Each structure stands twice: as structure tokens, then as C-alpha cells.
Amino acid sequence: MNVQWYPGHMTKAKRQMQEDLKLIDLIIELVDARVPLSSRNPDIDQLGQNKSRLILLNKADLADERQNEAWKEYFQKRGFYVVKVDSRNGSGMKTIQNVIQEACKEKIERDRRRGIKNRPIRAMVAGIPNVGKSTFINTFAGKACAKTGNRPGVTKGKQWIRLNKNVELLDTPGILWPKFEDQKVGLRLALIGSIRDEILNTDELAVELIRFLKTQYPGILTERYEVEETQKETELLCGIAENRKCITKGGELDYSKAAALLIDEFRSGKLGKVTLEWPKEQENG
């Protein structure tokens, strides 16, 4: 399954980000806790080499808590500050202010030595499409100051948001790389909804999800759909269609409808708390 998505405006956004980096002290990078590495932009590490870094594991409530902790440790080992959040219900938000101060303590001390008082920390909020940047800013700032939507690429333009006397946020459009070198990355991003569904083969996507769940979360499909997990992936999809009565007008099983239902129930968390990539895979190379 070949997945690619890189609209032209993303190239412009990357150039804009390079300019904006000159203005900021800290990069706050949102990743999806279900796919923390795949939902990172590989350009950000290179572009932000000399900046303080904070990674927010967003939608942590939808992810496997054991893996949340493992990913937190993974990134901390690599020099990042890390906070688990859910920008929709505000979970973890109170922690962020203190972590921002901690991440920028060298900048604050440098200002103090120069006699500069009360200069706010300027932070860039970055992340790939549909990872929850605008919702995070709305929740963090306490008002709907950034346009939100659940379709990739909805956030446009540049906005400075003054949170308080200590912190100003710059919202930037998410950036997705031009080509997925590893097709597993594209697959994972497609499953969490960071790539437009119109350009995807939903049936193939569902089969790949079933294959992963059978291996890493045995029993989860049986519990939800009363199917036998020893079956092949396509047979399991058939069983899900039967369980949920996904039938065409002609009376046949509607595999595409069942596939869409499975993916939707994964994305919404109805299937259970699932993380699609685990840090031990990265440690093992």
C-alpha cells in the first residue's frame, strides 16, 4: 500500500518555519501518542537543533499507558522534555507551564544576567496535520483563538497567541514530509487519520490493522466483535461485517463498510487503548 501526501502549501510552510525559528526560544512539538515516532516530522530535529525542545504525547488517553510511559522515557533519554496530554479534555495541561519554564531555564538565566526582565518565552507549536495542534492551543490558551478542524491541513497562516506575561505561542501549520521512506510510517499515519481518507484503500488499511492487533493485542477483536482471531485477516473482516450487520442492498456482506467501521472505532478509542508502534522496536533498530 503506497501512501503519500504532501500538498504544495506544506513546502511553503516549511520555509516559513525556518524563518519563524529565528523568533522563538522553544519548540513545542505535538505527536500522536499512538504513533509517536511516525507522527514526528523528521525535519524538525535538523531545523531546531539550537532550540529547547518539548514533546507533547497528545491523545495519550487513546493510547496504551504502558507504551506512553515507555515513549516518555525514550524521548527523555534523547534530551527532550516530555508531557503526556489530551488536548480535548485538558489532561496534562497544568503541567506544561512549569515544564516550559524548566526547558527554558538557561534562556531565563541568560536574560537575568543581561539585565533583561520579564521577556516572555516565545514558543512555536509544531506538528503534522490532524495531530491536535489547534485544539491544544485552544485548550491551553483557554479560548478558541486558533481555527480547529479534523481534516488534514485545516490550520493556515501564522498567529501569535499571548498566554500570559511569561509565554507567547506561535501557531504554525503542520508539516508532512514529501515522501514516506518507510511505508509503515504512511500506514500508521493513515490509521490515525493524518492522511485524507479519500486517497486511501480502506479495506487494505483495515486488514493491516487487524494483522497488527492479532499480534500485539490478542483478544481485543474477539472481545469487541465476537470473532475467532485464529482466522486470516480477510476472514476476520468478514466476521466483523457479520457481527455489525454490514450488508449491501443486494444482501451481500459489505467489507468496505466493515473496514471503515473498524478504523473509526480504533480512532475513537472504542476498540480499546492501542499504540501502533512501540519504542522497543526502535531500540532494536
Question: Model-derived features: where do they sit?
Answer:
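Helix-rich effector regions associated with P-loop NTPase G domains
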Residues: 1-27, 33-43, 47-53, 60, ...
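Canonical P-loop GTPase G-domain recognition
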Residues: 61-126, 145
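Conserved active-site beta-strand-loop modules that form the wall/rim of enzyme catalytic pockets
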Residues: 87, 137, 167-170
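Gly/Ser/Thr-rich helix-start
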Residues: 91-93, 128, 133, 154, ...
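Alpha-helical scaffold segments in soluble metabolic enzymes
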Residues: 95, 99, 135, 208, ...
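Solvent-exposed alpha-helices and their adjacent loops that cap or buttress functional pockets
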Residues: 116-118, 140, 161-162
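Glycine-rich phosphate-binding P-loop
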Residues: 122-142, 146, 172
